[in-house]
């Protein structure tokens, strides 16, 4: 059985993912974003992409799922550009895994 992938963010940033067959969840506001990420986790989504702009407002929700195996919550830039939050998280995880920042 295939695992599901979803993307959460503002409408303009997430609609393009629909063409790739990814479930899209446009949100407005932090409360809606939190509820959407929680709903995806409960509905067995293996990967949840969240735009960096949305992630800024729901940091505690993102951190809660970082401690879990699934879903993998991955931050991506929005159509407004990157905040470098996602890349910083990748860098931190690599450093934690190998003991040194190789990026």
Swiss-Prot record:
- Point out the gene that encodes the protein: atpF
Family the UniProt entry places it in: Belongs to the V-ATPase F subunit family.
Annotated source species: Clostridium botulinum (strain Eklund 17B / Type B)
Which cysteines share a disulfide bond? none
Function of the molecule? Produces ATP from ADP in the presence of a proton gradient across the membrane.
Q: What taxonomic lineage is listed for the species of origin?
A: Bacteria, Bacillati, Bacillota, Clostridia, Eubacteriales
The UniProt entry's GO biological process terms, in alphabetical order, are:
proton motive force-driven plasma membrane ATP synthesis
Q: What is this protein called?
A: V-type ATP synthase subunit F
GO MF terms listed in the record are: ATP binding; proton-transporting ATP synthase activity, rotational mechanism; proton-transporting ATPase activity, rotational mechanism
Superkingdom classification of source = Bacteria
| Keywords from the UniProt entry | ATP synthesis, Hydrogen ion transport, Ion transport, Transport
């Amino acid at each position: 059985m295939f695992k599901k992938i979803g993307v959460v963010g503002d409408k303009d940033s997430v609609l393009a993912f629909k063409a790739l067959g990814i479930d899209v969840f446009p949100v407005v506001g932090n409360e809606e974003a939190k509820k959407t990420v929680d709903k995806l986790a409960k509905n067995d989504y293996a990967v949840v992409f969240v735009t960096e702009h949305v992630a800024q407002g729901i940091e505690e929700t993102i951190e809660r799922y970082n401690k879990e195996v699934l879903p993998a919550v991955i931050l991506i830039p929005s159509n407004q550009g990157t905040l470098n939050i996602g890349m910083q998280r990748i860098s931190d995880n690599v450093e934690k895994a190998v003991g040194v920042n190789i990026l």
